[in-house]
């Protein structure tokens, strides 16, 4: 059965909370990209999203792992607040204020995921020296101990129940990643960096992509899985998949992706 994919803006202002069990998602800062002046100048910054374990409390991030807990290094790093992207260094105070508004101090963050290596997405890594880092495909523990992990397009990284990191190449090359959070009040939320710049970007994302073929595939995978997408430079949006009647010819979207209608 074929189907149409429709997207529509998710109402609400930042910080935007999507409660869930065992993880909630909080969009702390909404990214933007706006032309400025003449020529091709753009003022931009990336979205910042917090993933909070339901059982987290300020003391729990610093507890010692129990002997019976068989966890990977990544799963242990995800025991506390997880930050997905950090915006640019010019957003330092806004980021600290947004975290404080959720009762989270920089030292509480146990894992920072950088979706890709652009300055408007990982410009504040220095605020979190005590956190493990997963930037693109590089995973390191505090102090610079790098560990292998095996992430691939057909092999997501499991951080916890319903919490995964996906390889979603394209925009920044072959090493972009996205974070999937299942079990929220709105279904599956995916924080995707610049795989989607914003809702309704079909006519513009290709010009910013290092590998449009790979990114097109990543976008299709995300649209086939997510109920809510947090893009890199715009407001979160819902993804609504609708079954369609049998057709003599397949529906086509404007850019050849999963057929999409924007609400």
UniProtKB/Swiss-Prot annotation:
Residues noted as binding Zn(2+) 1 in the record, renumbered to the chain: 116, 118, 171, 194
UniProt enzyme class: hydrolase
A Pfam family assignment: Lactamase_B
Keywords: Cytoplasm, Hydrolase, Metal-binding, Nucleus, Zinc
Catalysed reactions, as listed in the record: a ribonucleotidyl-ribonucleotide-RNA + H2O = a 3'-end ribonucleotide-RNA + a 5'-end 5'-phospho-ribonucleoside-RNA + H(+)
Cofactor requirement: Zn(2+)
Cofactor note: Binds 2 Zn(2+) ions per subunit.
Residue spans of biased composition, Basic and acidic residues class: 249-263
GO biological process: one example: histone mRNA metabolic process
GO MF annotations, alphabetized: metal ion binding; RNA endonuclease activity
GO cellular component, one term: nucleus
Entry-linked Gene3D superfamilies: Ribonuclease Z/Hydroxyacylglutathione hydrolase-like
Sequence segments annotated as region (Disordered): 242-263
Residues bound to Zn(2+) 2: 120-121, 194, 233
Role of this protein: Endoribonuclease that catalyzes the hydrolysis of histone-coding pre-mRNA 3'-end. Involved in histone pre-mRNA processing during the S-phase of the cell cycle, which is required for entering/progressing through S-phase. Cleaves histone pre-mRNA at a major and a minor cleavage site after the 5'-ACCCA-3' and the 5'-ACCCACA-3' sequence, respectively, and located downstream of the stem-loop. May require the presence of the HDE element located at the histone pre-RNA 3'-end to avoid non-specific cleavage.
Domains: entry comment: Contains four of the five characteristic MBL-fold metal-binding motifs, with two waters completing metal coordination.
Similarity section: Belongs to the metallo-beta-lactamase superfamily. Glyoxalase II family.
Record note on quaternary structure: Homodimer.
Protein name: Metallo-beta-lactamase domain-containing protein 1
Species: Bos taurus
């Amino acid at each position: 059965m074929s189907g149409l994919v429709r997207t529509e803006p998710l109402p609400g202002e930042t910080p935007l909370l999507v409660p869930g069990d065992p993880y909630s998602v909080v969009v702390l800062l909404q990214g933007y990209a706006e032309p400025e002046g003449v020529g091709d100048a753009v003022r931009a910054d990336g979205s910042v999203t917090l993933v909070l374990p339901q059982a987290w409390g300020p003391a729990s991030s610093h507890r010692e792992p129990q002997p019976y807990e068989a966890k990977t290094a990544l799963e242990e790093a995800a025991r506390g607040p997880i930050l997905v992207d950090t915006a640019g260094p010019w957003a330092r105070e806004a980021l600290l204020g947004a975290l404080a508004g959720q009762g989270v101090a920089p030292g509480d963050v146990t894992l920072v995921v950088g979706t890709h290596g652009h300055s408007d997405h990982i410009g504040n890594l220095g605020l979190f020296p005590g956190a493990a880092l997963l930037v693109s495909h590089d995973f390191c523990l505090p102090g610079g101990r790098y560990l292998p992990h095996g992430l691939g397009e057909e092999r997501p990284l499991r951080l916890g129940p319903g919490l995964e990191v996906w390889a979603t190449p394209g925009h920044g090359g072959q090493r972009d990643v996205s974070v999937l959070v299942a079990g929220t009040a709105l279904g599956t939320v995916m924080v995707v960096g610049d795989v989607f710049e914003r809702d309704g970007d079909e006519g513009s994302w290709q010009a910013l992509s290092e590998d449009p073929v790979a990114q097109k595939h990543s976008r299709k995978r995300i649209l086939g899985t997510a109920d809510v997408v947090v893009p890199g430079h715009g407001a979160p949006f819902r993804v609504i998949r609708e079954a369609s009647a049998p057709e003599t010819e397949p529906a086509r979207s404007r850019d050849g992706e999963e057929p999409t209608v924007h609400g």
